[in-house]
Amino acid sequence: MRSCQYLLLLFLASDTSNDAISEPTRKSQLQKIESKRGSVTQWEIHGSRLLRSSGGKIKANEERMETEMSKLGALFSRGIKAMKLVHSTSFKTLLHLKNNVFANIMETEGALHALMLGFHPLEVKSRLEHDHDIAVQLKLSLTHWERNPETKNLLSLLEKQNEWMKSIQPPASLSAGIKFWEEGLQKLDSLSCLNAEKILEETISQLSQEGLSGEALVEKNLSPFVYGTALYYMGKEQAKVLSGEEFSAWYNNQLKRFANFVNAYRDKLNLPPRYAKLHLFADFEVHDGVAT
């Protein structure tokens, strides 16, 4: 009898110990199952990590953009100060400044903004083709170009320009520049302009009038592309006849007027600072294939 009681107590004790040992194991197994099913706690932890990660990236991008824009502003200031110190007719200094500003605009604002500011399409295209870093940064922008019908037409125009640009030497003087520009436009089927010389001469005449502000030039339907072309040839001619100080003063006035023109042009067309629609040849109205 006593042996039976002893065996019964031994059996109950062993069963209780098994329960005590297996309980943590069962809890561990349940936790593993819940985590595999995607419990709320696991998703909350993952979501908070993702939020911290993306928030840091957004803040870093904003800080980088502010830094780049401050660099661009500093570059303009340094360029103006450098031009004031020029004591000889150095048009190369102007071109050097223009190229530096162009590179910064391409990097910070993109190709569309550079075109809207009056930089020649071939300059933009060449920069995209030969500068690997900018090409990588603007990869998304270029993809947008190819998908957008309006900008796709612009890319087609650049290809046509590139074809005849290879066979024509750059202009060496104002008269050669006018002929060069006119011949180029005539070779474009979509822009068969017959009076490019007249338009360019009228533009230079308007820019020569110091009383006309940038806003007044916008009211005369002057586009950034034609403005930039005329200003380029004006600068070359002025550099031949003006002293260093006179040329610096002339250039600073032109820079201020061009800045006013760009702001007024943007306001007139209701263009945002970025991703603006382009009207490079806004001065031309085509009627029956003839530009007027």
Curated annotation (Swiss-Prot):
Motif (RxLR-dEER): 49-64
Compartments (UniProt record): Secreted; Host cytoplasm; Host nucleus
Main location (coarse class): secreted
UniProt keyword list: Host cytoplasm, Host nucleus, Secreted, Signal, Virulence
Signal peptide: 1-20
GO CC aspect terms: extracellular region; host cell cytoplasm; host cell nucleus
Induction entry: Expression is up-regulated in spores.
Domain notes: The RxLR-dEER motif acts to carry the protein into the host cell cytoplasm through binding to cell surface phosphatidylinositol-3-phosphate.
Family according to the record: Belongs to the RxLR effector family.
Function text: Secreted effector that suppresses pattern-triggered immunity (PTI) in plant host.
Protein name: Secreted RxLR effector protein RXLR-C19
